[in-house]
Every structure is written in C-alpha cells, then in structure tokens.
Amino acid sequence: MVGTYTGVLIADTATPTWHEGQRELPYIFAASAATAAGGLGMIAAPVAEAGPARRMAAIGAAVDLAAEYRMETSLGIVAETLHEGRAGRLMKASKVLTAAGAVGGIVLGRRSRIAAMASGAALVAGSVCTKFGIFEAGQASAHDPRYTVVPQRQRMERGGSHGAVST
C-alpha cells in the first residue's frame, strides 16, 4: 500500500517529528488511506451497497485516531509541532473531520444518501488534513534546533546512542 510506504519513507529521515514518530507513521498513513478510500466509497456507492465502505472507513478512522494519539503521547517535546501553528490547526481539523465522518457514516450513513456523502466527504477531508498536518509538523520541527538537540540529549542521558539519531 503506497500510504504505508510513504509513512515509512518520511519516518526514515532526520526531520525530528517524522523520525521520532517512526513507529506510528506507517499505521497512521495506512489507516488514513483506508479511511479516505472508505469515505470515497460512501460518496460513490448507493447506500444499500456501501456497507463494506462504511466498515472500512470506521475501522480506518479508529486505527488512525488511536495511532495519532499514541504518536502524540510518545514523541515528547517534538509533539509540540503537532499542536502549534498550521500543523496544529490541520491536525485538530483531521481529528474532528475523521471522528465526525466515522460516526456519521455508522449512525446515519446507512439510511440517508446525503448523510453518507457528507460523512464520506468529511472522512476524505480528514485524511487530507492528517497528511498535510504531519507534513507541516515535520517542517516546523526541522526549522527549530531544539527539536533535534533536546531529544538527542535525552537519549544520551538514558545511555542511548551518544546523541546520534537511531533508526
């Protein structure tokens, strides 16, 4: 799946937010892609035939939100970049759109074509916001040296890799 590979590729860089999130990014990118695909299926398919798309969207949304939460709580200081500025706004929008789209798809999407289409559009938009939010957070972390220096010092204090970025 291209989404997973993209997550692996950006995590294998020296960009602090992306590198520190290397365990979660492939899951986030795969789940976000599944969520968007399910959302697109909800938009395109008749309500009676969109059950598999709704299920894929709901599962993708749950995994996406869980992996994002895990990443945000495990990154330490670098997680600041996911909550501030443009990245923070995009990540907040991604959570709201993804959750609303998933709930709307499950609750209303099986009865109303308009609700299914609106929920599907919210899921696709949430996926886009996730990708661009992570991109912006990586850019922000690359421009501020403390997001490189502080994690390196913390690894050294724990007896880690003498400040080198580990993969």
Regions found by a protein language model. Give the residues of each.
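Short amphipathic, positively biased membrane-proximal segments
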Residues: 1-167
